[in-house]
Each structure stands twice: as C-alpha cells, then as structure tokens.
C-alpha cells in the first residue's frame, strides 16, 4: 500500500494508478 501520493509504485500496490500512487484506491 502506498504511503504518499505521487511516489512510484507497481500494480501490487492497492492504490497504484499508472505507475504512481494516489491517496485512495483507483477508480
């Protein structure tokens, strides 16, 4: 789970959108 919005992430992170974190889950 991403800790802060805007950090890079992967699809395994629950709130990862297009390679970057968002504050809440993807819509």
Curated annotation (Swiss-Prot):
Q: Which domain of life is it from?
A: Eukaryota
Protein name per its UniProtKB record: Delta-conotoxin TxVIB
Its localization reads:
Secreted
Q: What does UniProt list as this organism's lineage? A: Eukaryota, Metazoa, Spiralia, Lophotrochozoa, Mollusca
Q: Which GO terms describe its cellular component?
A: extracellular region
Q: What this chain does, per the record?
A: Delta-conotoxins bind to site 6 of voltage-gated sodium channels (Nav) and inhibit the inactivation process. Induces membrane depolarization and spontaneous repetitive firing of neurons.
Q: What cystine pairs are annotated?
A: 2-17, 9-21, 16-26
Alphabetical keyword list: Disulfide bond, Ion channel impairing toxin, Knottin, Neurotoxin, Secreted, Toxin, Voltage-gated sodium channel impairing toxin
Domain remark text: The presence of a 'disulfide through disulfide knot' structurally defines this protein as a knottin. The cysteine framework is VI/VII (C-C-CC-C-C).
Organ and tissue specificity: Expressed by the venom duct.
- MF terms per GO, please? sodium channel inhibitor activity; toxin activity
Q: Which family does it belong to?
A: Belongs to the conotoxin O1 superfamily.
